[in-house]
Amino acid sequence: FELNATEVSAVYAVQQLKDRLKNPSSLKLLSVAISKPYENTSVPIKIDYTAENNIGGTVEDTYYCVVSLATYDKDNDTWSCGLESLFQSRYRLELVNSLLGSKSSIEGSQEYAKKEYNRGKPANLDAEKIISNQALTIKEVEN
């Protein structure tokens, strides 16, 4: 499959989701959508999926994130992408608060990403094309 920058951004988002799952190999995508219009630098993404939980049951859920629009380096034949900085900082704060057992009054990463996604018009991507390209190497960049 030939991928465009938006699709590579979605592949990266699915890779990030897999990193958060207890059983990443159980991930099944139900749908993948981006929100248009998005800024040239950020892509809000919504992923509906199922995965196995730690007791063997299947959970259906939605994951929202905001990633940078992937860029392609022709000289090195590599794609680059990363989590959008506001999304990433909110996610890190959630992790720290979780470790400390405290709550934050700041809007969480999922709420932030869902709000960004809902600001635009959803456009579905081919979920099969996204999941079949999970082996794609994407250089992670800080935004």
Predicted segments with their positions:
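Cystatin/cathelin-like cysteine-protease inhibitor module
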Residues: 1-143
